[in-house]
Regions:
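Short, well-ordered coil/turn segments that N-cap beta-strands
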Residues: 13-15, 42-47, 72-78, 116-118, ...
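Glycine-rich, proline-tolerant flexible connector loops at the mouths of alpha/beta enzymes
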Residues: 15-38, 53, 85, 172-174, ...
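Conserved, mostly hydrophobic/aromatic
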Residues: 20, 38, 69, 111, ...
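Short, acidic/polar
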Residues: 1-7, 151-158, 264-271
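An alpha-helical appendage that flanks or caps ligand/catalytic pockets
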Residues: 10, 101-135, 177-279, 311-318
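Acidic (Asp/Glu)-rich catalytic clusters
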Residues: 9, 35-43, 66, 70-76, ...
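Internal, glycine-rich beta/alpha segment that forms the wall or movable "lid"
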Residues: 58-165, 177-180, 184, 192
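N-terminal beta1-alpha1-beta2 module of alpha/beta enzyme domains
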Residues: 1-48, 144
Length: 318
């Protein structure tokens, strides 16, 4: 993973983000530790969690840890807050799922207060109360970036908009265009609550894979993706095992997966950015059992071939 971060920086990609998981089938439980290691030999790439499960973390420690990454990286760290795709962290750290909403809301508010004020005064119900204590170290960046991720829940969208925080949509199924009403509502509600439109940034995160040969990419990506989806489908009633037909739709022009050769993937990225009015697009490349050397090649193609096509298109468009 450190090699991936260093390569992503070398080929000129903008950001590398790592998720927090507490399962046998995922490698990282503490993204900030890996990001700190990735900061050492990189110069430009931004380093983010994707996501930090704030509901089952201590907001003070989350801020301190990422402020440390920000110092090591000379101001390149970001936090992406979320509830997380899985619930293992709740019993693991002694939290109840019955407090799901309250934990997320209070802890998100607490870390925003920590970002705003060096000296923390806080009365908590699901968090500790703090009376005039400093939280250190402070982030290098004056307005330390905190994004909030959601799978497309309307209430979450409006809550994030009300706070004027940048939002990240996990678009991993269906037609990405279905998210347009949510994005429009986010921007409208954010402005109604007095937030400057320039701060109401929208990002999307989707799965994908790139190879020089389109057919190779599509065939190679299927089985690792199916394996992951099928595993989740055994745990969640609203998921179903992936068929080849479903996969073909997902990698097609109206699907949510970005798989193919560099030109195909670039064209599809341009399409989603334009249709949804995105400020940032993040492609989740490594998944399941894809060999490490193939993941590195995909990152290389993303940085050297896909990204230049996308950047040139929007540069020419003005």
């Amino acid at each position: 993973m450190i090699e991936e971060i260093e390569l992503a920086d070398k080929v000129g990609l903008d950001i590398y983000a790592i998720g927090e998981h507490h399962r046998k089938d995922f490698a990282v439980s503490a993204p900030e530790i890996v990001l700190a290691a990735g900061a050492v030999n990189t110069k430009n790439i931004r380093l983010s969690s994707a996501t930090t499960n704030i509901s089952t973390n201590d907001p003070v420690r989350v801020y301190q840890n990422f402020a440390t990454v920000d110092a090591i990286s000379n101001g390149r760290a970001e936090i992406m807050l979320g509830r997380g795709s899985f619930t293992e962290s709740f019993p693991l750290f002694g939290y109840s799922l019955s407090d799901y909403e309250e934990l997320f809301t209070e802890k998100m508010d607490m870390i925003l207060e920590i970002r705003k004020n060096e000296i923390l005064n806080w009365k908590g119900s699901f968090t500790q109360s703090v009376d005039g204590r400093g939280v250190y170290p402070r982030a290098v960046q004056k307005d330390f970036p905190i994004w909030v991720a959601t799978g497309g829940n309307v209430e979450s969208t409006l809550r994030i908009a009300e706070k004027g925080l940048p939002i990240v949509y996990a678009i991993i199924g269906g037609n990405p265009l279905n998210f347009k009403p949510l994005i429009d509502a986010y921007r409208k509600f954010g402005k109604q609550n007095g937030h400057d439109e320039k701060h109401l940034k929208v990002a999307a995160h989707s799965w994908g894979y790139i190879a020089e040969n389109s057919e190779k990419a599509k065939k190679q990506y299927f089985h690792p993706t199916k394996s992951l989806v099928d595993q989740i489908s055994r745990e969640r009633a609203h998921w179903s095992e992936m068929t080849w037909e479903q996969y073909e739709y997902s990698i097609g022009p109206n699907g949510a997966m970005f798989v193919g050769n560099p030109e195909e993937v670039a064209k599809k990225i341009i399409k989603i950015i334009e249709e949804l009015g995105l400020d940032r697009f993040m492609l989740h490349l490594p998944i399941g059992s894809i060999p490490h050397e193939d993941v590195l090649k995909s990152i290389e193609l993303y940085g050297t071939k896909v990204a230049p096509i996308v950047r040139e298109y929007f540069r020419n468009k003005g």
